[in-house]
Amino acid sequence: MKKILISVMLFAACVFAVSAQEKEKEVKKGWSFGVLPTATFSVDNGFQAGAFGDVYNYGDGNTYPDPLHKFSWEVSYFTKSQRMRFYLAYDSKYLIPNMRVNVSATYVRDPLYSFWGFNGGASLAGLANPYDLWTNKDVNSNYFGINYYGMSRNMLRILANVQGRIVPHLNWAAGINFWNWQVGDMKDTGFKVKGDNDKHYYDKTSTLYRDYVALGIISADEAAGGNALELNAGLVFDTRDIEAAPNRGIWAEAYLNGNVLAHQYLKACVYFRHYVDIPIHIKAGDPVFAYRLAWQQTIAGQTPLYMIQNVPLLVQRNMISEGFGSSNTIRGLRENRILTEGFAWLNTELRVKIVNFKLFNQFFYIAVNPFFDAGIITKAARAQAFERAKTANAATFLPLSSIYDASKVGDIVYSAGAGLKIAMNQNFIISAEFAKCFYKPLDAGLWIGIGINYQF
């Protein structure tokens, strides 16, 4: 998959280099459509089939490269995890004068969702190779395969966020997000084992999810899911010249985010992003050094199982905003590998445009972005529950000593890699990134992430 993607992108660069004299800064008017098949692959979920895209309305071009209105959508299915995703979103800074409106609806069905436990490297620390127990189809003595990290979840999310101007570049922000979660054992449809025509299944009783419930780390009133109604409010400081891929400016947010239904909690969220233009005058555009400093922590209450993976955002850049690990935070880690109550992280990358060109009356550029990511847990999840579990008299598939080591909670996680981007009209950006985690307990080999947009 990696070789095919790189070949296609290099071919595009060669074919259209003759048009590299075209300037991206030309004005785009009217409607613009970006539609692509979701022919991607990830280690966590397998191949993705479906389609996604953005629809932009630039009006008379006075706001270009920012659109007057933006619609985003996706319909897709993943072959390995059998995940289904449906997504529709709208974003505009011009629908209501001096206000930004962002609304979306999302449905995700995850029959084979991977739950890696709480607190990152502390989870599964006693296992020589935790990934031996991940979707292992070799039949054991009970005629079952082992997917120790398997569980299921269905999610419905409806959100609406607004921002209004206080003074130039400083906005107030507020929003409301509704979630409905149904979680439980894997919903396994069966699989074939080489040399055997019978259909086999994963053992639903031998999972980390079941062990956490038995040990009391996951309580009975959250084990099957529930509803959440999150309210958020805060401030946004924004001096970016372009939203999708800034050349210069600062984008900072500070806000509180809390659930007012069952399992109430309150989180503090701080994000600081800085984009620095490097005056090396490449024909396609100056390189940009970009970095993000971020911190999210529960300051009151306890986040339930079904919400702990969420990374609250005032404006959605991607369909799913979750997971310390994977494309949203620390690249090179498995999806949602770090589930905790507090986390601080750093992302740095150098964005270099290689070539720009015009095709079918659309403006394109190709860029690369080498990057380095790092993060650390600032507040562990369920620390008291893990202490109580040491004396729990419960039948589990693996003992607590094999699946948790509290001494690793404070370890620094870091990774590095590089990405390739193709952008249309400076807004519709196809992204392919490759990374490696250098913190051994969370190293799972080469990570591949293919999707849309820069990470931040």
Label each residue range with its predicted role.
Residues 21-32, 59-68, 95-101, 165-172, ...:
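Short loop/turn motifs that connect adjacent beta-strands in outer-membrane beta-barrel proteins
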Residues 23-33, 41-221, 328, 442-455:
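Gram-negative/organellar outer-membrane beta-barrel architecture
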Residues 31-33, 45-49, 82-86, 152-158, ...:
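Residues that define the transmembrane beta-barrel architecture of outer-membrane proteins
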Residues 33-35, 69-73, 99-104, 170-174, ...:
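Transmembrane beta-strands of outer-membrane beta-barrel proteins
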Residues 41-43, 55-57, 75-81, 105-111, ...:
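Transmembrane beta-strands of outer-membrane beta-barrel pores
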Residues 51-73, 230-274, 417-434:
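Surface-exposed extracellular loop regions of Gram-negative outer-membrane beta-barrel proteins
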Residues 234, 242-360, 380, 402:
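C-terminal outer-membrane beta-barrel translocator/porin domains of Gram-negative envelope proteins
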Residues 293-295, 421-456:
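Predominantly the C-terminal beta-signal and adjacent terminal strand-loop region
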